[in-house]
Structure formats: C-alpha cells, structure tokens
Amino acid sequence: MQSFNRINSMKYFPLSNGEQIPALGLGTWKSSPQVVGQAVEQALDLGYRHLDCAAIYGNEAEIGATLANAFTKGVVKREELWITSKLWSNAHHPDAVLPALEKTLQDLGLDYLDLYLIHWPVVIQPDVGFPESGDQLLPFTPASLEGTWQALEKAVDLGLCHHIGVSNFSLKKLEMVLSMARIPPAVNQVELHPYLQQSDLLTFANSQNILLTAYSPLGSGDRPAAFQQAAEPKLLTDPVINGIAAEQGCSAAQVLLAWAIQRGTVTIPKSVNPERLEQNLRAADITLTDSEMAKIALLDRHYRYVSGDFWTMPGSPYTLQNLWDEI
C-alpha cells in the first residue's frame, strides 16, 4: 500500500462556534484491541485526522498508546486531530460524568477531547457494564438528562472537552436537550445510510446548527451476531448503489460514503483493512450527480441495522417506541 497525504484535501464541516470537524473519520466500534492500534496507525499515515471512540468499545487504551507513538514520531500533532468519545450509560449520574471522562482521557493519553457525546438516551445502574436484565435499567427522563447535561457543560468549562453532543437521539429528544442546554449539542451521532435516511431529523438538526454524524454508513455487516437480524438487506450489494458505483468507477462503499458527505453529514466508517482505509478516505473526493442523489433518495426504507432492541428486555423501561419516539 502506498501511503499518501490527504490532509490538505480533506473536507471539513463547520460547527456552530466556527471550529471545523473533518467530514470523514475512522470508526473504532467492533475493532478489537489486538488490531485497532495498527488500524489507527495506518489511518494516521494515510491522512485521517478524525477518530471516533467510546469507552464501551474497550479499546481506548490501545488507541491511546498508538496516538502517543504518533505524537512522539511527529506523524501528527494533537491539535491536528479531532477525537470524539462517548459517555456510557452507567455514568449518567452527574457525579459520575467527570470521572468517566477523566478515565477516557487517561486511556487515550489526552488532555482534552474535541467532542464528548452521551452514547445512548438510556440509563444503566452504575455498577453494570451492559445490562443482562431489565431491572438493571433505569428510566431516561428530562430530570436525569438535565443532570447529565449540566455535568457535561462543566466539563467544557473545565477544558476537558471542547464540544458536547449526543448520540442516538430522536428529534423529540434533541428538542428536550435544547430546551435545557446552556451549551447546546454540537453533534448528534446516529445511524444514517440510504436505507435509513432520517430526513426529518437532518432538517431539524440543520435548523438548530447541530451536525449529524453517520454511524454504520455501510450497513454494519460485521457487527456482533447478537445485533444482526435474519434476512436483513445488504447495502453493499444494493443494485442501485452498485449501478452508481459502476458509473462513477468506484466501489459501492465509496458511493455510500460520498452520499453521506454530500448530504452534509460527517461519516465514520470502521475498517482495519489498509486498502479499505485508503478507499474510504478517497470517497471524500467523489461527487455524485443530482440524478444519482435522487436515485439514492428513493431507497429509504426506514431500516435500522442497530435497532436498539438490546435495551428492551423484559422489565426494562425502554421500548423501541419510546427509544426512538416513533409510533
């Protein structure tokens, strides 16, 4: 693989305060600790300047070791990177937010994050990593959100993170946080792809100067088996997507990423494969025609690969209806 530098041609999106976030980043969900460090090293060499992390992924310490090595070697400077992480659902209590953030900073070897997100609008008992029964889940309420959000605002005041935001928030829940926020959310990271286009959410977010980040932009075919459903549609083999790829002379994955960026959404595909890392980065240079965008618009089927049903076990306060605020 020939390394190439993409820093000067990377697309950026402006945030409400004038700072800019790289339009394409490296997702690290499902990247095991044994391989994530090498993937991050290769990504930085290729010109990636945006990493999307989370405490629950269990690999932040290895990412931190890779970052430290890159800083020492002069591959990249901290101020050239955009690094996001996420607050897990067992640390929503106001007293738990700063310790959780400080643990992430320690693992990543950083003094600050560029962006810190509430990972899910779901609350777990403090001593539980991932719930195995419904009684380990607590209700997500306006009062609980307000306490969490005020602690995140304090983290910004302390300089521990530059921006705060949310993930997996519906339009209704975005309105909820906006109604109580001194510092409004900069980003809402949600599942976004041609089968789940979320146009209403995108329109609302744009109206509030909130940027959407698209996770699972390629359909997340490699997610854990427990998260997969029988006979689910495969984005990467969709005939419309592949027809456009043939016209453009690129891969189906590149069409999906170019589509996301062209809609004004950040996208964070995960890969540990050097060739795919490079292909994904090149997608930022692809421009789809109006006709191609119109064809993709017709593919929306409101299909979630990450349905959230793992929060809805018996005895849980969560249903798919109140999680996504859909009828």
Swiss-Prot record:
Any one GO CC term of the record:
cytosol
**Amino acids binding substrate:** 119
Kindly list the residue ranges recorded as spanning the membrane. Answer: none
Which residues are catalytic? 57 (proton donor)
Catalytic activity annotation? a secondary alcohol + NADP(+) = a ketone + NADPH + H(+)
Q: Which Pfam families match?
A: Aldo_ket_red
Report the Gene3D superfamilies cross-referenced here.
NADP-dependent oxidoreductase domain
| UniProt keyword Nucleotide-binding, yes or no | no
Member of which family?
Belongs to the aldo/keto reductase family.
Q: What does this protein do?
A: Aldo/keto reductase with broad substrate spectrum. Catalyzes the NADPH-dependent reduction of aldehyde- and ketone-groups of different classes of carbonyl compounds to the corresponding alcohols. Highest enzymatic efficiency is observed with 4-oxonon-2-enal (4-ONE) and 4-hydroxynon-2-enal (4-HNE), that are lipid peroxidation products, and 9,10-phenanthrenequinone (9,10-PQ), a photoproduct of phenanthrene that is one of the most prevalent polycyclic aromatic hydrocarbons in the environment.
User: What name does this protein carry?
Assistant: Aldo/keto reductase slr0942
